[in-house]
Structures are given as C-alpha cells and as structure tokens.
Amino acid sequence: HDAERDWCGDFCIISRALLENSGVDPKEIRAVGASALGADCLPVDEQCRPLRKAILYGIDARAVSEIEQLTEMYGIEQIRKWYGRPLCSSDVMPKILWIRNNEPEIYAKTHKFLTGSSYITAKLTGNYVVDRFLGLASFNPLYDPKTWQPVPELCAPICRPDQLAKIQEAADIAGLVTTRAAKETGLAQGTPVITGTDDSGAEAISSGVVKPGQ
C-alpha cells in the first residue's frame, strides 16, 4: 500500500465525508482514533514521510529468507517460547530485517517502523505510538512484555530501539490533532486522539464485544 495515498489520504476523505454527511460540529467531538490493518511494516523518516510502500501482514511473504535466518539465529524452541508457534509472514520482525537486508539505504533513513494505525495516529498528532496488542504481539520479542520498552539486545540484530514506537493502551491519549491535520481532515485542532488498534480489535469493540467471554 501507498501509505500517504491509501491510508492517510483515504482517512482524510472519510473524515471529511463523515463530518459533512452527519452535520456534527467538529468541536463537539470528544476524541478520535484509527484502526487499520494489523501487522504491517512502514518505515518513515523524521517528518513521518513514508520511505517505501508498506509491507502488509501475512499476504506479503517476501521475508521467507529472513524467517529462516531468524529461526537459525534464535532456534525454533526459543521462537516457540516467544510466539507459541514458528515465525510466519504475519510477524513484523522478519519484515524489518528484510528491509535491513535488501534496502539498506531505506533502513538507514528510517526514523520509525510503524503499523497502519500508528502511522495515522502519527499523522494526526506528530507522536509515534502503537497499542499494546500490536506492539507485544506483532513486534514480539522486540519489546519487554512487562515494561513495554524495547529490549536492546533483542533489537540489535533487527533495528535500533529508538526506531520503535512507544507502546500505550489502545484507548490512551496519544496526542492532539495538529493544525495541519485539522485542515486535512476537517477535525478540530486540539481534538484528543487515542492510540488506536488493529482492525479486528476495533471490529470486536464496535460489535459490543467488550467483556471476557463474549
């Protein structure tokens, strides 16, 4: 996907259409959040400009060699402890390593590796965050599950710790809509933006699945 066109561009179109068709005053909106495809990998520069098209979740299987490389590096038993299964094309770690191995010039320019929802949130607020589910599951084992901080020794063969977004809960406030984002989306400047999450999590909440056992 072209993140600037397909993700951010379409988000702006949808946001403006919703506001226009609903007649809701943007200043009355208490908070907004984005959901998007899950374990994507999008490298961006310091201005949050995409450095290449996003590598999508399981349907993009280009990182087969990197999965083999990581399995040999860590051992299948250790990987099973982390994931409960072998590595697969849905995991972000092999995608980052693929960029490092095959597009070193892009890797060198990368400020952050983002998912779809974290990219939209960054475009709205200027802050780089990822929700706990995506951070701990899709980027496993690069974050410590107890502290939510990147683990330097595990990141070292893959990426720098500072290339990863900050983990927050999906409903935590990530920041406020910037002046530029307000002009592009029609939202009011200063509107709170939550961290957001992946599509399946948001779909569950929207259908009323909010308690254990539902």
What do these predicted regions represent?
Residues 60:
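Carbohydrate-associated surface elements
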Residues 206-212:
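Alpha-helix C-terminal capping segments
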Residues 44, 79-200:
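Gly/Ser/Thr-rich active-site cleft segment
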Residues 55-56, 133:
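Short clusters of small/polar residues that mark proteolytic maturation junctions
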